[in-house]
Every structure is written in structure tokens, then in C-alpha cells.
């Protein structure tokens, strides 16, 4: 692994430990060069309550690696989380910078009704 990835994973591990201690439901984000993924994970980390990604049938046809796609994923995961009965989450950015696609997803999830 590259040094950049190792430091990102270290940051993510520290943040997840704090969220686990608080026992809150978390919105976990992962991004690759082509896609973005979001999952709402239960407080104990054992169950995925809702998920959305650019690989979903509704989003697969358009562009998948840009800010517009991240916004659509954020709205979709917020809609699915509310359907599952989740309204408050902790935002787990998985060590990625809060910038660009990650920020767009978070803003869209907030607009969709999730409270961070």
C-alpha cells in the first residue's frame, strides 16, 4: 500500500473508534476513481441499514465519478435511511478529505433529511 492510503486508513480507524464509543449510527462513504458508495451502518457495526452507490440501476446510466453523481447518491441514501427509520447519523468520511465528491454527498444527504 502507498503511504497516502496507509495514512487515510489510519485516520479512518481513529474516527471509527470514536464513533463506536459514542454508539451512533454512521453514514460511511467510500470513493474510488470511477464510483462513490454510501452505507448507513448500525451503531454496533453489525448491520447495514441502507445503502446507495453509483452502481445502482437508477444511477448507473449517467456519469458515475463526478460531483453530480455524488449528489444523487447522497439524496438516494438519505431517502433509503429515512425509510429504514434512521434520521440521525454520524458522518464517516473514511479518511477522505471533506471536499469535492465527499462534501457533495454529505450536503445532499443533509438536504434529504438526515441530521449529522
From Swiss-Prot:
One of its GO terms (biological process) is translation. Coiled coil: none annotated. Keywords: Ribonucleoprotein, Ribosomal protein, RNA-binding, rRNA-binding. It holds the Pfam family Ribosomal_L18p. GO terms for molecular function: 5S rRNA binding; structural constituent of ribosome. GO terms for cellular component: cytosolic large ribosomal subunit. InterPro entries: Ribosomal_uL18_bac-type, Ribosomal_uL18_bac/euk. Belongs to the universal ribosomal protein uL18 family. Part of the 50S ribosomal subunit; part of the 5S rRNA/L5/L18/L25 subcomplex. Contacts the 5S and 23S rRNAs. This is one of the proteins that bind and probably mediate the attachment of the 5S RNA into the large ribosomal subunit, where it forms part of the central protuberance. This is Large ribosomal subunit protein uL18. The gene is rplR.
